[in-house]
């Protein structure tokens, strides 16, 4: 079995993996797992990264996995951020401003015990966003969030 590469920055991940991906926090590896959603490695984790920058994002929660968390009181992988990897950075580790035409930025959180959706700080459920930064401190920020309802 070949070891998966580890990346520090989103542009390293995008250059190596590219395309549509599904990302989730990997507690055991203290990083994000990046799963390919197209190409020959579709459905496989192809990299681990300390930060990820995504465009055209959808927030996905598998309700069956969430119910298992609630019943067993034990974590499992059931919530994901789907999007396209981006490389638009300023070379100093900061996102160029403006990368997109952003009207609103919110912090995004997910807690299976609070509700079945990713939410902003006001507990408004989110379906997706124009862009998302998943940073090395495991905080997530969405530009132009798309609220449910």
Please name every model-derived segment.
Residues 5-7, 19, 32:
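Short structural boundary motif marking the start of a folded domain
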């Amino acid at each position: 079995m070949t070891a998966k590469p580890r990346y520090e920055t989103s542009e390293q991940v995008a250059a190596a993996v590219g395309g549509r991906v599904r990302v989730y926090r990997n507690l055991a590896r203290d990083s994000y797992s990046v799963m390919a959603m197209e190409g020959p490695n579709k459905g496989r984790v192809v990299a681990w990264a300390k930060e990820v920058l995504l465009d055209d994002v959808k927030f996905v929660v598998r309700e069956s996995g969430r119910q298992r968390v609630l019943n067993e009181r034990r974590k499992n992988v059931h919530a994901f951020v789907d999007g396209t990897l981006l490389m638009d950075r300023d070379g100093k580790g900061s996102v160029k401003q403006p990368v997109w035409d952003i009207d609103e930025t919110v912090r995004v959180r997910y807690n299976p015990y609070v509700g079945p959706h990713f939410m902003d700080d006001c507990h408004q459920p989110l379906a997706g966003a124009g862009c998302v930064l998943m940073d090395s401190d495991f905080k997530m920020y969405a530009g132009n969030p798309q609220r449910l309802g």
